[in-house]
Amino acid sequence: SENAPMSMIAYVISDRPAGLSIEKRSERVYYDDGAAAQLLGHIGRISDASLQYYSDLGYPMDAIVGTSGAEAIFEEYLHGTDGSMRVTYDGAGNVTSTEYLTEPTRGADIYLTLDIGLQKTALEALNAQLEAVGSQCGATVALDPASGEVLVCLSMPTYSQEQYKNDWQTRAATEGAPLCNRATEGSYAPGSIMKLATAVAALEEG
């Protein structure tokens, strides 16, 4: 049983029925839900198209990998290595001992330049503007003029990453294509190039 209720877990722990054991696993939890869904991306099973690529890297067929956004771009850093464990059972199927043969290692931490507070402010402003013009699609990007760091990277409509984990088909079919990151994947006609030149000059003058 997956996502077993605490009552079932308590029963297995206390009564130890033959052949039953508890297995813990990690699960990705998303905070600031929807504020940067397309940018952060998702994790999932290896697709058929990517199976050979990940197999050559030593991934098992049932591995969970980044499938879009930062999760996919930084997969090689975020993905740890699996360990192996020897588990001994008695005749009744109960676990009598466990021993790590190789220790698992966790993936690295990565830090984006995104300012989540500014991202949320941009989300509210873009929502208001889209509502005013009767549209649901738009994008906003803000850079630090001194360093070039990306502070805001926003695409609308957005969606709940927590809901996506359990019902990605619905998210994919939603009107407005919320899985598309319009800030990075859209094609747009450039505006006035001279305005950029005068803006740069103004910034240099302070």
Enumerate the language-model features and the residues they cover.
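Conserved protein kinase catalytic core
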Residues: S47, V150, Q161
